[in-house]
Amino acid sequence: MNNVKILEVKQSIFASNDEQAAQLRQSLKEKKIFLLNLMSAPGSGKTTTLRSTIAALKDELRIGVMEADIDSDVDAKAIAAAGAKAIQLHTGGMCHLDAEMTRQGLEGLGPQDVDLVVLENVGNLVCPAEFDTGAVKNAMILSVPEGDDKPLKYPLMFQVCDVVLINKIDVLPYFDFDMDKCREYIAMRNPKAKVIPICAKTGEGIAEWADWLREQVKAWQA
C-alpha cells in the first residue's frame, strides 16, 4: 500500500488538555477501542517494534496505527505494508501530540472497526511525556545504545509509562549497558512499570510484549 493518508493535525488552544483526554478515553471505552501511546527517542526502533507487534497480533486483533512525525510518510507506509491500518500525522513542527490532535488522528483513521490503535508519538523524551493524549496506557522504548542512565536524566517519561521496552538487546555485548542498573533506575522512577527486554529485529521478547498488550486490550474491552 503506497498511498497513505496524511493528516495535518493542529494543537488545541482552548479546553483543558486533561479534560479532553478524559473525554477521549471515555469515548474509546464506549467503542471498546484500546489506544496505546508509544514514545521514545529517535532511532530507538519504534517502527520496527511496531511491525513485529503487528505480526504477532494481527490474526487476533484489528490494529490501527497513527504515525506522528514533523514531516514524511515513510513510517506509515512501512506499517501499512506490515498489515495494519495506518495514517500519518504531521505535527507542523510540534514535538508532541495532545488529546485534541490525537482525536483528529483517530477521526482521520476512518471507520473505527479496530480493537487496538497504537499512537507512535514524535521521537522525543521530553515533550510527549508532558501531554495526556487520551491513551489507555503509555509505553516507551529505550534502546541499549542510548545508555542505562536515561531514567535518571528523563524522569517524567519513565514516571508516566506503564511499560518500558528495552530494545536492541542483541547489541548488549558491545555497549556499556547494565541491565540490572537500568531496571533499578526505572523502579526508582516508577516501581509499577513493567520492564520487557526485546530485540525487535530478531523477535526476542516480542511474545512477552504481545502477551502483555493482548491482556490489556481484552481487559479494556471486557
Language-model region placement:
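Hydrophobic positions on the alpha1 helix immediately C-terminal to the Walker A/P-loop
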Residues: 49
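Active-site glycine-centered loops adjacent to acidic/histidine catalytic or metal-binding residues
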Residues: 69, 167, 199
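Conserved C-terminal guanine-recognition region of P-loop GTPase G domains, centered on the G4
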Residues: 128-135, 144-192
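Nucleotide-state-sensitive switch-loop elements of NTP-binding domains
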Residues: 3-26, 31-39, 44, 53-136, ...
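Residues at the C-termini of beta-strands that transition into short coil/loop
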Residues: 90, 142, 199
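Secondary-structure boundary/capping positions in well-ordered alpha/beta enzyme cores
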Residues: 60-61, 112, 164, 192-193, ...
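Canonical P-loop GTPase G-domain recognition
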Residues: 171-222
